[in-house]
Regions:
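Acidic/His-rich, divalent-metal-binding segments that scaffold phosphate/diphosphate chemistry
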Residues: 1-64
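A short structural micro-motif
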Residues: 33, 58, 95-97, 128-129
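Buried hydrophobic packing segments
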Residues: 33-37, 72, 76, 119-125
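Acidic-glycine-rich active-site phosphate/pyrophosphate-binding loop
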Residues: 2-8, 81-102
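Conserved small/polar residues in nucleotide/adenosyl-binding loops
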Residues: 134-136
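Conserved active-site and cofactor/substrate-binding residues in soluble primary-metabolism enzymes
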Residues: 5, 9, 25-29, 67, ...
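His-Asp-centered metal-binding catalytic motifs of divalent-metal-dependent phosphohydrolases/nucleases
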Residues: 45-76, 85-96
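A contiguous pocket-lining binding segment that forms or flanks enzyme active sites
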Residues: 101-131
Length: 136
């Protein structure tokens, strides 16, 4: 039987593979946006799951940038994690490193959110205040 992670367990897994403050900030940002859209789109009973998908979407990026979305599947399967989580996080690499298409609305939101939060973060860094006025 596959394991469901709570937020604390997901954070521990993320920080096992990521230490760069930028990557951790990005993960928390995507988590927050995913939680927002889960509620906004009528998936209120899955807010925590959507958030964990956002938090773990780049689990393997810091250690395995050339194997992004590939290594994370192995890492999660070794821990017997939920296949929905594995599919969702891997799908945001569709057309780049994997051929797993975003199918569920959550996966499509992740696909867009990952890029948009990166763009917004880059734009914020261009401001004199940088990220100092942004609190997650």
């Amino acid at each position: 039987m596959s394991k469901q992670l709570n937020r604390e367990e997901a954070w521990a897994l993320l920080t096992e593979y990521n230490q760069d403050p930028f990557h951790l900030h990005h993960a928390r940002t995507v988590e927050g946006v995913m939680r927002y859209f889960a509620q906004e789109l009528g998936y209120g009973d899955e807010v925590d799951f959507w958030g964990i998908v956002g938090l773990l979407h780049d689990l393997d990026f810091e250690r395995y940038p050339d194997q992004h979305c590939i290594q994370s599947q192995e890492i999660m399967r070794e821990r017997d994690l939920d296949e929905r989580l594995i599919h969702a996080t891997a799908s945001h690499g569709y057309g780049i490193t994997v051929d797993i298409q975003p199918e569920h609305e959550m996966e499509k939101v992740l696909f867009a959110t990952d890029e948009l939060t990166g763009l917004i973060g880059a734009a914020a860094l261009m401001r004199p205040s940088k990220l100092s006025l942004i609190h997650i």
